[in-house]
Design a protein with these regions (language model features):
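Short, flexible loop/turn segments with low-complexity composition
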Residues: 80-86, 181-191
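GST superfamily/GST-like fold recognition
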Residues: 135-160
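Extended, well-ordered alpha-helical scaffold segments
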Residues: 114-122, 162-176
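GST-like domain detector, emphasizing the conserved glutathione-binding G-site
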Residues: 1-122, 129-134
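Acidic/histidine-enriched, glycine/proline-rich intrinsically disordered or flexible terminal extensions
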Residues: 187-206
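Surface-exposed helix-capping loop/turn segments at secondary-structure junctions
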Residues: 128-137, 178-184
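Alpha-helical transmembrane segments in multipass membrane proteins, preferentially the mid-helix core
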Residues: 125-127, 151-152
Length: 206
């Protein structure tokens, strides 16, 4: 049996989602190991003690622990200055406010509405940029939309009511894509000794 790189992932995690999107787009075959975060596999913890997903172990033993670095490796993606700026804002300021909007009870002294408003500054800027040309590359869209999706899903009625037509259209296109459907295929948590699960699966198996 042909050896394959191993990807430890968690289906709903936006960081893991962006890594899987790159893998699907490129047709980069891996063995997918779905993780239960409260019971992380021993092998995953051995190769990546920080214990977060995604983790990609290459055939030569190299371990890539950051989602953006996995995207760059799989896609051979060299970010432009604009792309790097958007990813930095997404992973920095937006993710900071997203976490406090979605999980206010995890943080002391947090006002949920305040963080929704602060996150909306980024989303409004994103809406403006999406109305311009040239449009975002698939790689950049895939790096960003899982986090916007998470924000939108927390209160979809509120999100849909905002004056962000370009953002709404972009997100819906991302979610309706064949690549996203293949990225989000449901699998059972991995257990040691089971038959390996190839990812992405052949199109006809979804």
């Amino acid at each position: 049996m042909e050896p394959l790189p191993i990807l430890y992932s968690f289906r709903r995690c936006p960081y893991a989602m962006r890594a899987r999107m790159a893998i699907v787009r490129e047709g980069f075959r891996v063995e997918l190991r779905e993780v239960v975060l409260r019971d992380r596999p021993e092998h995953m913890m051995e190769i990546s003690p920080k214990g977060t997903v995604p983790v990609l172990q290459l055939l030569d033993g190299t371990v890539i622990e950051e989602s953006l670095e996995i995207m760059q490796h799989v896609l051979d993606w060299e970010l432009s200055e604009e792309e790097a700026n958007w990813v930095e804002r997404n992973d920095g300021e937006f993710k900071h406010h997203l976490d406090r909007y979605k999980y206010p009870n995890r943080y002391e002294g947090v006002e949920q509405d305040e963080h929704r408003a602060l996150a909306s500054v980024y989303l409004s800027d994103l809406n403006t940029r999406l109305g311009q040309q040239p449009s975002f590359s698939n790689a950049l869209s895939d790096a960003l939309f899982p986090f916007v999706r998470q924000f939108a899903n927390h209160d979809r009625m509120w999100f849909d009511a905002q004056p962000w037509p370009n953002l709404h259209a972009w997100l819906e296109a991302c979610l309706a894509s064949e690549a996203f459907g293949r990225c989000m295929v449901k699998v059972k948590p991995w257990v040691s000794g089971q038959d390996r699960l190839l990812f992405p699966q052949a199109e006809g198996t979804l």
